[in-house]
Each structure stands twice: as C-alpha cells, then as structure tokens.
C-alpha cells in the first residue's frame, strides 16, 4: 500500500505533508518552498502555471490568473458573497448552466473543482518527486463549516487530480492532531482558532490520553465560510484606492493591471505591519492621464490598518462564544489555544484572542503547516502507519425533515460526532395517502422555511390506510467525510427510497451565520411558532375526529346539535391557518362545548360494539410523529 498524503488545500496557500517513519514531514515544492500559493494562471501559449510561477506573472496577466478559488467552491452565482467577489476580482466569475459560480478563462467556462485540481496535481507531483513512486491516495482538509456541497466539490477536485480522497477532515481538527501528537501528555481541552485566507473556524476539542492512546473528540465547532485574509486585503486595497483618488482624482478600480499591482502591494504591506509600526506603499507608474504618468507613494501605519480591519476581527468573536456555549464550557476550561492560518500572525488578531480566552495562544504550532501535518497524521492512521490515535469529528449544523405544520424536525443535532446514523418513524397526515415527499433540511430554526433546503425525494406506493397508521421510517446516515445519505421506508409494504444529498448550492456565509445566530436571537419567536403549530395540529386532530364521530352518529344526533357542531367545525376550520393561537384555542373550546351530546352518542355506540373505549384506535399513533408531506414536482 502506497503513502496516503495529507493536503491542506487553502484559499491563499496550500501545503503537503507525509508520514515518514512515524513522524509527519512537510515537503518542499519544486521552487524549494514549504507552502505553495493557491494561484493558477493560464498563459497565452496554453501553458498552465501553478503556485509561485503563476503569482510572478499575475501583474501582466490579471484576467487569466485565478486565486481564492476556494471561496467559490459549492456556491451559487447569485450568492451575495459571490456577487461581492464579482465586482472586485480581476478575473471573470460567471453563472454555470445550473446556476453555480464558475469562472471564464480565455472564453472557456471552468468549474472551481476543475481549477482547484491543478493545485492538487502540483501537491501530488511534489510527493511523487520526493517519494520516487506514484501517489494515488490523499486526505484533504476543508473548513469545519463547509457544507455537504463544498465537501463533495473538494472530493471532485481530488478525483480530477487523480487522487482517491480517503477522507475529508476539518482544518481545526487537523491542526489539533498536529498539536496533540507530540506535545505534552494527559487529558486537556483546547480551542483551535483558524483564520485563513478565505474562511474562519473555531473548534473546541477534547484530547483524552490513556496510556499513550490519544482520542481527539470535537465538542463543538462554529465559523464563517466567507471571512479571511482576502477580506483584510480588500479593506486595505479600498483604502489605498480611495486615498489615491483623493490625491490624483483617478479611480484605479477600472484598471485591472493597476489593481493587481495594488493587491500584491497591499498583501506585502499587511505582512510587514505584523512586525513593523509603519510601511510605505510605493508603486511608480501605477497609471497615467493626459498630464503624464502617476505614482502611488503612501504611508500606512499599523494603527491605520487595525482601524480598517477591527470589525472583521470582532466578527470572529461571536462564533467563539457560540462554540463554547455548545460545548457546555467556559473560557477557564480551555487549557491551550492554538492559532492556525496565516492571518493569525496579525498582532491585533492575537490580542483579541488573548483577551477573549484570558491566556496567550501557543507559539509552538506553525500556523501555515499544522493543518497539512494533521492531514498526514490522519492519512497515517488510515494506512496503519500511525497507531494509538482516534479522531472523532462532528457535523456543524442540525439535519432534519419538514413535518406537519411546516416544522423542521431534527434527526441529527449540530455538533453530533460523525460518522452517525439515526432513524425516526413518521406517519401520514391524510387518509389513504399513497405517497410522501421527504424534504431534507439543514439549520437551527423551527420553521422549515427558515432553514437551508438540501433536497427532497418521493416515497410512493404506501398502502392505503387511515392517517397516522402507516409507519414510515426515515434514516439519516452521515459518513466520516460529513456527507449525508437519507432513506425512507414504508414498514408495511417494505418499499424504500434512498438518496445521497447533493445540495444545489453551498451554504454561504450569510445563510450559515443567520441560521445559528438567528436561532438564538429569535428563540422566543421560535417558541411561539412551535406552540402555534402544536395548537394547529391539536385543532386539526379535533376537526378530523369530530367529523368522523358526526358521520358515524348519523340520525341518532338531534338536528339542532348537528347544526351547532357543523357551525363550530366551520369556525375552527376558518381560523386554523391563521397566526392567532388564542383564537384557535377559543374555537376549539367552542367546538368541544357543543359536542357534548355527540360524545354521549359515540360512547353508546362504542359500548354497543363492545370495544370498551372510543379512543382505542388512537393508541396506535402514540409513538408516531404526525408528518405532513406535500408532493412537489421536480423543477426541470
């Protein structure tokens, strides 16, 4: 069996590591560097350049030099974040036929996984050159908050690059593996703060050390899939452009060549300001007008840069609070804080993290290499080269289905350890219902429409029966890569339908943040909605049973009583779809009050039939959740 390599496929830089003997080793690429810029260029003569060679020619070929592609993986063209990138990126982002965000290079449309595969090919070649043998298997890391589509797209990129992706693991978890492998012994809880080029993650991880056997268990994870060093660069670029416009009256945003030079200068200035208090951005001949060439020469202080990006750094603090809360811990329970990602070298980031946790982050973990090392460790575990290490990762958001009244019923809660499998029995909402549509959702809200729709499928051929009688077992199965498989089975007929969820688009930063944060901010409105739906369901049940009793009673019920009950039924039916819980309850009480005589008749009939109670048939439903499914025609 060959080596399983570990790859950190980053937004800004990528890195590769292997297990040599029993120790991880980061490999140098053909340029002699331990990290490779995640940049791909398509030259005029048809050559594809990757890494440093692509970066070097970017100023003269901005429209065909692609970077930060990871921000587009698994996203829709119309996503707000993609539209923001469309306006600032020098290359062309276009809509694919299915609505995904793709790129156009020299008139040809290309998918993000196709482009990311070029970086993975270079990583693969680096390993093959070092090992002197073919490499076909890899562990690739992704942000913890990547959703199903983005994970699938990453696996696709691996396949395009000729790699069998044995496992997708979360970046903070990989960093914890790198930290925990040879650091101190004993049980401890750590926080991994991962601020990379395009994404942010926080994971709370418990390391249990029993006689040298280490278990890495993720307790909670949170993050933002569209926040990273690229956003910090953009803030500085916009400031430089605005200052130049004030000084010279020329807007450089319309000049791709100037913007590419400015991007490089801004990135360089940002890095310099991590160790210096002031730097110069000096770009001669940046542009020209009728009066001649123009030069940019601006001083930027660390204080100025910090004022531009402080809001971005503060945005990382809320996920920290949520992750700690989800883990049931406080900052005092965290023994070590690990910083991952190049952007964590910024003094302001380090200060904010130190202030939040009340302790200095560890300095002995390389933020650029830790993730690749962790991926290599996991590869070593899978290959049998690394013993005594067990990794228990989690799913970042709750998963469930839509049930009666438009409620999201979770089957797997967020931060559940994966792989995992959970089944629950649901039933029909209508008599003789022959088909149901299983609508799969991801998110934290009670109202199904407030969550992310991952897909839906039909289960038909259900045996005709009274509502609440069929037993439909829905099973959610998440594999070790965090990819979801759903099945639905009619326990009576044995008919079963399965699907591997492939969401139509990735969850964008706004959607994910909204799901978790709004779920907490709007907990009260969620509770009210849940109570309203419960009342609606009770009213619906009352309507159904009363109508059935009315039908069974026939002419044994006095005409006046029958008219009063029919009026009360009509009144309750009218308010049932409204939002006024009190009104529904009042109409239910009114129906119950006028149904006294009907109840007497029903009891007499039941006794005559010798079944000892009118509610015997209802008992069969007790362990079944009412579910209402609506068949939806697939949009072609």
Curated annotation (Swiss-Prot):
Renumbered to this chain, region (Disordered) spans 606-636
The alphabetized UniProt keywords are: ATP-binding, Chaperone, Nucleotide-binding, Phosphoprotein, Stress response
Q: Which residues carry this modification: Phosphothreonine?
A: 199
- The answer to keyword Phosphoprotein applying to this record is yes
Q: Which family does it belong to?
A: Belongs to the heat shock protein 70 family.
Q: State what protein this is by name.
A: Chaperone protein DnaK
Q: Which PANTHER family match?
A: HEAT SHOCK PROTEIN 70KDA
One GO MF term on file is: unfolded protein binding
List the top taxonomic levels of the source.
Bacteria, Pseudomonadati, Pseudomonadota, Gammaproteobacteria, Enterobacterales
Q: Which InterPro entries does its entry note?
A: ATPase_NBD, Chaperone_DnaK, Heat_shock_70_CS, HSP70_C_sf, HSP70_peptide-bd_sf, Hsp_70_fam
Per the entry, what induces it?
By stress conditions e.g. heat shock.
> Gene name?
dnaK
Role, per record = Acts as a chaperone.
């Amino acid at each position: 069996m060959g080596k399983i390599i570990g790859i950190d496929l980053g937004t800004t830089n990528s890195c590769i590591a292997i297990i040599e003997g029993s120790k991880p080793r980061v490999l140098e690429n053909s340029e002699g560097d331990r990290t490779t810029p995640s940049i791909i260029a398509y030259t005029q003569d048809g050559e594809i350049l990757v890494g440093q060679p692509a970066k070097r020619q970017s100023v003269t070929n901005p429209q065909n030099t692609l970077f930060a592609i990871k921000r587009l993986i698994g996203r829709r063209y119309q996503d707000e974040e993609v539209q923001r990138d469309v306006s600032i990126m020098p290359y062309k982002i276009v809509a694919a036929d299915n609505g995904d965000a793709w790129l156009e290079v020299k008139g040809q449309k290309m998918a993000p996984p196709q482009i990311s595969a070029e970086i993975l090919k270079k990583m693969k070649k680096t390993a093959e050159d070092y090992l002197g043998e073919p490499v076909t298997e890899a562990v690739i890391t992704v942000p913890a908050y990547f959703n199903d589509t983005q994970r699938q797209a990453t696996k696709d990129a691996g396949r395009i690059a000729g790699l069998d992706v044995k496992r997708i693991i979360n970046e903070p978890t990989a960093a914890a593996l790198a930290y925990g492998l040879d650091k101190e012994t004993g049980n401890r809880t750590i926080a991994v703060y991962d601020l990379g080029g395009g994404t942010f993650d926080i994971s709370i991880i418990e390391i249990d050390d029993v006689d040298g056997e280490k278990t890495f268990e993720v307790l909670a994870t949170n993050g933002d899939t569209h926040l990273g060093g690229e956003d910090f660069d953009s803030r500085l670029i916009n400031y430089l452009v605005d200052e130049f416009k004030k000084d010279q009256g020329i807007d450089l945003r319309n000049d791709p060549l100037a913007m590419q030079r400015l991007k490089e200068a801004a990135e360089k200035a940002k890095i310099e300001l991590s160790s210096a208090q002031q730097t110069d951005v000096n770009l001669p001949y940046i542009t020209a007008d009728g009066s001649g060439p123009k030069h940019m020469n601006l001083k930027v202080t660390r204080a100025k840069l910090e004022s531009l990006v402080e809001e971005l750094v503060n945005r990382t603090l809320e996920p920290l609070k949520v992750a700690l809360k989800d883990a049931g811990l406080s900052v005092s329970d965290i023994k070590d804080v690990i910083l991952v990602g190049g952007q964590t070298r910024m003094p302001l980031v380090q200060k904010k993290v130190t202030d939040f946790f009340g302790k200095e982050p560890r300095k002995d973990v390389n933020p650029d290499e830790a993730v690749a090392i962790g991926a290599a460790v996991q590869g070593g575990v899978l290959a049998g080269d690394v013993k005594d290490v067990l990794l228990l990762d989690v799913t970042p958001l709750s998963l469930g289905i839509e049930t009666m009244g438009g409620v999201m019923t979770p089957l797997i809660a967020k931060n559940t350890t994966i792989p995992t499998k959970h089944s629950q029995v649901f039933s029909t909402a209508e008599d003789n219902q022959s088909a149901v549509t299983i609508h799969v959702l991801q998110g934290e809200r009670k109202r199904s429409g407030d969550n992310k729709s991952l897909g839906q499928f039909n289960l038909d051929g259900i045996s005709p029966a009274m509502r609440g009688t069929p037993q439909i077992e829905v099973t959610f199965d998440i594999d070790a890569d965090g990819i979801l498989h759903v099945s639905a089975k009619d326990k009576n007929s044995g008919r079963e339908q399965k699907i591997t969820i492939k969401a139509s688009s990735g969850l964008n930063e706004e959607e994910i943040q909204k799901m978790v944060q709004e779920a907490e901010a709007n907990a009260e409105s969620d509770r009210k909605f849940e109570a309203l739906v419960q009342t609606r369901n009770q009213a619906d049940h009352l309507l159904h049973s009363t109508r059935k009793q009315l039908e069974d009673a026939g002419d044994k019920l006095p005409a006046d009583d029958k008219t009063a009950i029919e009026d009360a039924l009509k009144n309750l039916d009218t308010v049932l779809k409204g939002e006024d819980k009190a009104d529904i309850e009042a109409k239910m009480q009114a129906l119950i009050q006028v149904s006294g005589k009907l109840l007497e008749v029903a009891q007499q009939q039941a006794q005559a039939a010798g079944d000892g109670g009118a509610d015997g048939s209802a008992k069969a439903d007790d362990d079944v959740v009412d579910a209402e499914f609506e068949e939806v025609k697939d949009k072609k």
